[in-house]
Regions:
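Short, solvent-exposed secondary-structure boundary motifs
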Residues: 71-79, 264, 315-319
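Exposed beta-strand-loop-beta-strand "reactive/processing" segments of non-cytosolic proteins
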Residues: 268-327
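N-terminal trafficking/processing presequences and adjacent post-cleavage segments
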Residues: 243-277
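A short, surface-exposed interaction/processing loop segment used at functional sites
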Residues: 314-353
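Secretory targeting and sorting signals
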Residues: 1-22
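Exposed, interaction-prone regions of secreted/extracellular proteins
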Residues: 22-244, 330-333, 344
Length: 353
């Protein structure tokens, strides 16, 4: 009997992979509900069919709080087996976009050379609709990023070596009262040394931090993740425009001061704004690629001691840190299209056009 009880307890423990107590979620301590494959064999890409029935970053999803909630996929880079470097692809709601923007698409990377860099796409992302996220190594230390089979623009992570030694997909949230009801399906990986794709992340296990949760629904290809999925919001679910916490029309300097505050620096210094193009700004921060649009952009740069509390990072990865914070603000709309933290100053001479 004792042996049977011990065996039962051991089996239960095996199912409860990396489950943490309910400490709460914050911008400095994100919560997750994922399936994760650490120290995987060498891979060169990943695919996940992502869907959300609900994605709200807080109990007040139409109010700007600096929080976000994501449904996403990470593919490790540079031989990292646990999340030091990566490319990610998925959907988000909340910061750095205004709460009124609703759900948007994004991708981001963290590279050995240049730190964290995020790219947001203000497009219509619907609930209960499947979107295919794909990340694929193309050689020359570069990865292409796709949504539904289409290369994003921008959509190339450069100076980011292969191989991948971890794959992960699921939810990430910065607020204990976030609401997520998501799924991932048809998980694939690309084998070493070729273009062969195969289904199943056979080495992955559910990982969650309460109140988030995740589990396989058809291992090792399909999973679900949830976080307060059925709790009623204080506001209606229909997204609508709200007044930003920043008064007046979009102001790049005000935006970077707010970004600095949210990323641990109350007194940023030597703030500089340069009128340029998005492509030139990418080149200036070491991310130049042919697929970056030539749209007019304000590159805003600040210095200080920044910790990327607002960075979308895999569980267990340290928040990106650096002395340089930069935003790319669309000159027409005032929307933040890209932002990053680095220890490398932008090459300002590259942005003049």
């Amino acid at each position: 009997m004792i042996a049977l009880v011990a065996a039962s307890l051991a089996a239960t423990a095996a199912l409860a992979v990396a489950v943490s107590p309910a400490f709460g979620c914050s911008q400095g301590s994100h919560c997750y509900g994922t399936v994760r494959w650490l120290s995987s064999p060498d891979y060169y890409g990943g695919v996940a069919a992502l869907q959300v029935a609900r994605l709200e970053q807080s109990n007040t999803p139409t109010v700007d709080t600096g929080d976000f909630a994501n449904q996403e996929m990470w593919v490790g880079t540079n031989g990292s087996g646990g999340g030091a470097y990566w490319v990610e692809d998925g959907m988000s709601r909340g910061y750095p976009q205004s709460a009124g923007a609703g759900i948007y698409w994004f991708w981001a990377d963290n590279r050995p050379c240049c730190g964290y860099f995020e790219h947001d796409f203000i497009v219509t992302i619907r609930t209960s609709t499947t979107y295919n996220a794909k990340i694929n190594f193309i050689g020359n230390n570069s990865w292409n990023v796709y949504r539904d089979g289409n290369l994003l623009s921008p959509g190339t992570s450069t100076s980011n070596p292969a191989p991948s030694n971890f794959l992960e997909s699921g939810l990430e949230a910065t607020n204990t009262n976030a609401h997520v009801n998501g799924t991932g399906a048809a998980l694939q990986k690309r084998s070493a040394g070729g273009s062969s794709w195969s289904y199943g992340w056979s080495g992955a296990n559910p990982y969650y931090i309460s109140p988030a949760f995740s589990q396989w629904t058809a291992s090792p290809t399909d999973y679900k993740d949830t976080m307060n999925p059925n709790t009623a919001s204080l506001l209606a679910h229909t997204p609508h425009t709200v007044t930003s916490t920043l008064a007046g029309p979009p102001d790049p300097v005000a935006l970077i001061i707010e970004a600095a505050r949210l990323n641990g620096e109350a007194s940023p210094s030597t703030i500089r704004t340069i009128a340029t193009t998005r492509a030139a700004a990418f080149a200036a921060v070491g991310s130049g690629a042919d697929d970056v649009p030539q749209t007019p952009t304000e590159l805003v740069v600040a210095h200080g001691a920044f910790t990327g509390f607002e960075a979308k990072v895999p569980p267990g990865a340290p928040a990106p840190r650096g002395r340089v914070l930069y935003l790319l603000v669309d000159s027409g709309s005032g929307v933040v299209t890209d932002w990053g933290i680095s220890n490398v100053d932008p090459q300002i001479q590259a942005v003049h056009h």
